[in-house]
């Protein structure tokens, strides 16, 4: 049986990666959402939850005992050392869950898999995928989208962008680059063109 490559979908914050992920899901791909996994491991009952509290203090908790991601973000974004400490706690747990989900999907016969992961390069998880797709927009567009979406000031948005590998560097390491600075239809057409080169229509008839 022909097995499709696992796509590693990445990009910069507010580059529109979720749009590409949604289009691929509509086309029949199973999506492993690393951001969702990262949120899940910071809920009560997970080992990373207590480690983060022990490291950054109880002031990051909400009244009902959840980790307030906004408070945690203010501590780590703009402070590389603290961000590295947080990543050293969360990345191993995220990796463990991703491997588990890939195994579950492939064992059940699903071979159209997309790993949607913003920090694919930063977390050194490229070995999990066969092909790397980077969603690209110019930095000024990133800033505009991030400020509008999250209500950040320009400095707050820049701090979050600077906490990731520059998007231009990710583009250099990509197998596929999707320009998401235009319309959704333009983005969709790019994706369909790429998949047609894979003879995707033949696979879709399996």
Curated annotation (Swiss-Prot):
<keyword id="KW-0418">Kinase</keyword>
<keyword id="KW-0963">Cytoplasm</keyword>
<dbReference type="GO" id="GO:0004140">
    <property type="term" value="F:dephospho-CoA kinase activity"/>
</dbReference>
<comment type="similarity">
    <text>Belongs to the CoaE family.</text>
</comment>
<protein>
    <recommendedName>
        <fullName>Dephospho-CoA kinase</fullName>
        <ecNumber>2.7.1.24</ecNumber>
    </recommendedName>
</protein>
<dbReference type="GO" id="GO:0005524">
    <property type="term" value="F:ATP binding"/>
</dbReference>
<comment type="function">
    <text>Catalyzes the phosphorylation of the 3'-hydroxyl group of dephosphocoenzyme A to form coenzyme A.</text>
</comment>
<dbReference type="Pfam" id="PF01121">
    <property type="entry name" value="CoaE"/>
</dbReference>
<keyword id="KW-0547">Nucleotide-binding</keyword>
<dbReference type="GO" id="GO:0005737">
    <property type="term" value="C:cytoplasm"/>
</dbReference>
<comment type="pathway">
    <text>Cofactor biosynthesis; coenzyme A biosynthesis; CoA from (R)-pantothenate: step 5/5.</text>
</comment>
<keyword id="KW-0808">Transferase</keyword>
<dbReference type="GO" id="GO:0015937">
    <property type="term" value="P:coenzyme A biosynthetic process"/>
</dbReference>
<dbReference type="InterPro" id="IPR027417">
    <property type="entry name" value="P-loop_NTPase"/>
</dbReference>
<keyword id="KW-0067">ATP-binding</keyword>
<feature type="domain" description="DPCK">
    <location>
        <begin position="6"/>
        <end position="206"/>
    </location>
</feature>
<keyword id="KW-0173">Coenzyme A biosynthesis</keyword>
<dbReference type="InterPro" id="IPR001977">
    <property type="entry name" value="Depp_CoAkinase"/>
</dbReference>
<feature type="binding site">
    <location>
        <begin position="14"/>
        <end position="19"/>
    </location>
    <ligand>
        <name>ATP</name>
    </ligand>
</feature>
């Amino acid at each position: 049986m022909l097995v499709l490559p696992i796509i590693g979908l990445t990009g910069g914050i507010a580059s529109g990666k979720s749009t590409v992920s949604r289009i691929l899901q509509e086309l029949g791909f199973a999506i492993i959402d690393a951001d969702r996994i990262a949120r899940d491991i910071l809920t009560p009952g997970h080992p990373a939850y207590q480690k983060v509290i022990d490291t950054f203090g109880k002031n990051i908790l909400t009244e009902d005992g959840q980790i307030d991601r906004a408070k945690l973000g203010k501590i780590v974004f703009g402070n590389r050392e603290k961000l590295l400490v947080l990543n050293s706690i969360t990345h191993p747990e995220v990796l463990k869950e991703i491997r588990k989900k890939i195994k579950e999907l492939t064992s059940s016969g699903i071979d159209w898999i997309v790993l949607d992961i913003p920090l694919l390069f930063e977390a050194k998880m490229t070995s999990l995928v066969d092909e790397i797709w980077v969603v690209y927009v110019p930095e000024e567009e990133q800033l505009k989208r991030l400020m509008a979406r999250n209500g950040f000031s320009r400095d707050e948005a820049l701090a979050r962008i600077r906490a990731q590998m520059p998007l231009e560097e990710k583009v250099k390491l990509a197998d596929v680059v999707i320009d998401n600075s235009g319309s959704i239809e333009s983005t969709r057409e790019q994706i369909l063109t790429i998949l047609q080169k894979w003879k995707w229509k033949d696979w879709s008839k399996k």
